[in-house]
């Protein structure tokens, strides 16, 4: 099938690779423009652009798709389907209408739950037992289109956003290949009006831990914001990111550190920290963090006040 692929971050790369491996003709890859990155602030191509170029595929990275030139360029590709996954630009109606069989979006949630920008983070932060991937026929609304295929997965009790991200990326890659192979047999099912929730973009202000909250909420925050932006607390004046956790038991006032293993008391219950990162340092296991720190039992982490 003649496709246009539209994606930008790491999440999208396995999908592009799967479409190529399945023998689809990729007429063009669209991705966000290169951004300044690294210490030298040199322009760096997106993960999708870098992989597409390595595969020998043509790449376009327009700043907008609304100009007459951009619309004509897209229509000229004469694609049957556009596959869209975490592209980052809103597609105008003329783009949605250009492929003869429409635009298909890979969305990392079980729609209509968690429409929007951060469905993986929000599913973990909300304590959802399950999430998954949907293949949706795109329309003008935000993740409102009818669903062609869906597959659910359980969220592990210690799973982080990074881990779930990789699982859902692989699942989405397999599901879109299967969907395209069976496109003539699949029925697009409208999303129900009940159960709609929105996965708002993560605000860094959410990331500071409030140790007065129940351990379940703190654990979900830590896992849901790992690795980015990373839940954090203060040890003295030093910011410490908390990147892995599990539910534990300990007593004391909220924020109290207990050792062997590294645990922190919450409003109710406690969390055990499994991965941490001091400001300017590499990610460490809790054991390595304790070996390199002068933390004593009873030390207080300062949380959100």
UniProtKB/Swiss-Prot annotation:
It catalyses: L-methionyl-tRNA(fMet) + (6R)-10-formyltetrahydrofolate = N-formyl-L-methionyl-tRNA(fMet) + (6S)-5,6,7,8-tetrahydrofolate + H(+). (6S)-5,6,7,8-tetrahydrofolate binds at residues 109-112. The keyword Cell membrane does not apply. The keyword Transmembrane helix does not apply. GO terms for cellular component: cytosol. Keywords: Protein biosynthesis, Transferase. Its EC number is 2.1.2.9. SUPFAM superfamilies: FMT C-terminal domain-like (SSF50486), Formyltransferase (SSF53328). GO terms for molecular function: methionyl-tRNA formyltransferase activity. It is an enzyme of class 2 (transferase). It comes from the Bacteria. It holds the Pfam family Formyl_trans_C. InterPro entries: Fmt, Formyl_trans_C, Formyl_transf_N, Formyl_transf_N_sf, Formyl_transferase-like_C_sf, GART_AS, Met-tRNA-FMT_C, Met-tRNA-FMT_N. Attaches a formyl group to the free amino group of methionyl-tRNA(fMet). The formyl group appears to play a dual role in the initiator identity of N-formylmethionyl-tRNA by promoting its recognition by IF2 and preventing the misappropriation of this tRNA by the elongation apparatus. HAMAP family: Formyl_trans. Belongs to the Fmt family. NCBIfam families: fmt. This is Methionyl-tRNA formyltransferase. It comes from Roseobacter denitrificans (strain ATCC 33942 / OCh 114) (Erythrobacter sp. (strain OCh 114)). The lineage of its organism: Bacteria, Pseudomonadati, Pseudomonadota, Alphaproteobacteria, Rhodobacterales.
